[in-house]
């Protein structure tokens, strides 16, 4: 039902603009050819799409998937995607995945923190990690010739981290300060509230960082248990792009990740369902000069056929702030840019000329089996109703 609602929103977005393009083109327009419904650049765009490197995917015996795209570059990016985020946590251990990410680069049984930093620096590489609601990701950017070392470092980090008590206490303080910083970022606060009300009493409603009381109590045993429970072959994908040989990557995966545990008998536990609840939450503070608002409908999961149309609709609505001006088309403009400005800037023009908001940003957040499609905006309190009205009209 919700996906149908999102599809309806996408149709409402496209159809009026098709009509407006017909009216705007005119018989003498040399740029947009309405008769065929295509741009002259469509053939070139098709050729570019056909030139995308082939994606190769191979599974290991323990269930880990290996994926690559070889574009023949001199550099590469390789990362390990793990199904382990706040959606896989409960109220007691919420925040553990993010805490574990902080501990990733604090030393392993083979490398101290300093040794790891120096090795990455001497390679001219970049090592990083992040946690989302459904995944923890560790990745490295390096020269293609250093792919074997990059994969070995990633394997060492996730399998041999020392998780020292002193480092845990130090990172505990870092995370608590990070939480204070997040509270001052009103956009992040709004999106946490959006998830909390859209997915009430479900795992997707929890924050990634977790509550303060959990961060203060998480210990080494909690981190080890989380690794033991979630860092299994079927939950992982080793992916690389750039100057990457798939066969080489597959051999490296077998060497460094082949001993990871596979799924237990009976398979991995199913992902807990997260039902969408249409609702509203308002946090009022009259001392604040501006209102920060997010409006969303339930969208589709990553593998749903509606995902691509929703991504296109998200791009068409786009984003705007006052520094962009009113979206007036200047000459000369390419055919593609002209079309995008004609189609994508209507809401921006309304917001600008009506002085309805300071900024807005369309978003499409996808999860495994659900998602949120909507708009985030920053408005004066007196213009909220008008801005929401025009947003709904564009949908």
Question: How would you describe each model-predicted region?
Answer:
Residues 95-108:
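Active-site SXXK
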Residues 47-50:
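Short loop/turn motifs at secondary-structure junctions and domain boundaries
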Residues 73-86:
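Short, surface-exposed, low-complexity cationic segments
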Residues 84-94:
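Short pre-active-site segment immediately N-terminal to the catalytic Zn-binding motif
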Residues 2-40, 53, 59, 106, ...:
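Charge-rich, well-structured scaffold segments of protease-associated domains
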